[in-house]
Amino acid sequence: FRCALPISLGRTDEPPILLRAHDTDCKMVMDAALPLYKNLYTMHKYNGESLTTYEPRGPWSKIHSDLSALGSIHISNVHILANLEPWRWGSPDFVQKAVNAMHNVHGANALHLYPQASYWDWPYTADKLPDGKREYQLDRDWIWYKTWGRYAWNCHRDRSSEVEYWDKQLGDFYGTTPAEAGDILEAYEQSGEIAPKLLRRFGITEGNRQTLLLGM
């Protein structure tokens, strides 16, 4: 194992290998492999296959903290989020708090981000445009990628300064006054809590099989 993979690729270094917790016994693999191969990473889904909270706790969080203690970099995976489909979603405050939780509660130091919706249709959304063309996810869900990218890079940003930043971003995007942009940001922040709170109250089972979602 130590030599075969790099040699077969014609490399003298150790290429990165990622262990995904939902299909691998990471502890068993890490205990056996780390003494031989150092460039290993672990990854686990942040809230599962839904976005439910920026205050994670319980058995799911323990999986993260256990993985982050194994001796390599742990990656938080924002997976296919069934409870956000098919709507548009963007809450800078929620995302900043979630990334802080990834660091402080789960011990993660990297992010693997999936599209906000329509993963299997990438790069297109499910939206129908008037001219019949398909809309790109990077255009429709720009705030999704911008928030996660911004706070994955640095989640320790002053909140009041962030409000000013997002007011400017939204004002430029929608062509509004600063006051109107502030109202749009507030709408994003308030609506961003709805799907996570509903699932925390009524969801049964984890993943894209949730009773709440199957009934919608």
Where are these regions (language model features)?
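C-terminal functional modules
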Residues: 167-174, 179-216
